[in-house]
């Protein structure tokens, strides 16, 4: 009943564009004083499964380091770990997610005490996952019934527990870094938190 018919718009055609170009996902190391490139590594090359917002790109997350290793998160394209000289140590594909309104995947990874935290809140396919920072092996993963959020989590030690505090749709939640148990949550945010 509501399907478009060509005769309704004889001079126009409509469609949805999907990325069809191979993108190169690059990690750069620059000299802080001069801006000179020290090294450049291609993490992966692929055609993204979805587009990105015009003001954004597929490299939205900030790289994270523990002083020994560099962690680069390109969302559905993968998570890549390098030593500080550019040698790839490991990589993980954490799966593709459908992104809200083509805004991309922009939550940066956080590292604490040998654990790497990745939050992915997109279109109710949402998760929070903790990996071993040295090996990339999973420690725990929790599904989250969330819409879209793009806020990087915060690690806080309180009441004898190390907590991962992160936004959610309409609320803030705290998870136990050791095992992923929900410690507390409170309302007060809107959806699509950044």
Q: What does each of the following model-derived ranges do?
A:
Residues 1-194:
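Noncatalytic, solvent-exposed loop/strand surfaces
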């Amino acid at each position: 009943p509501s399907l478009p018919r060509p005769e309704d718009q004889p001079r126009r055609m409509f469609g949805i564009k999907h990325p069809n170009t191979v993108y190169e996902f690059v990690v750069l190391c620059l000299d802080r004083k001069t801006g000179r490139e020290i090294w450049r590594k291609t993490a992966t090359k692929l055609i993204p499964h979805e587009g990105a917002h015009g003001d954004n790109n597929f490299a939205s997350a900030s790289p994270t380091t523990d002083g020994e290793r560099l962690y680069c998160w390109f969302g559905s394209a993968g998570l890549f770990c390098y030593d500080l000289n550019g040698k790839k140590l490991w990589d993980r594909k954490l799966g593709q997610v459908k992104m809200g309104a083509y805004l991309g995947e922009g939550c940066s990874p956080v590292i604490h005490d040998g654990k790497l935290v990745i939050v992915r809140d997109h279109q109710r396919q949402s998760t929070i996952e903790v990996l071993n920072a040295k090996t990339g092996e999973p420690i725990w993963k929790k599904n989250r019934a969330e819409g879209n959020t793009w806020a990087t989590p915060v690690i806080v030690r309180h009441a004898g527990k190390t907590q991962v505090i992160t936004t959610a749709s309409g609320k803030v939640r705290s998870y136990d870094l050791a095992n992923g148990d929900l410690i507390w949550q409170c309302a007060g945010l809107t959806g699509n938190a950044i």
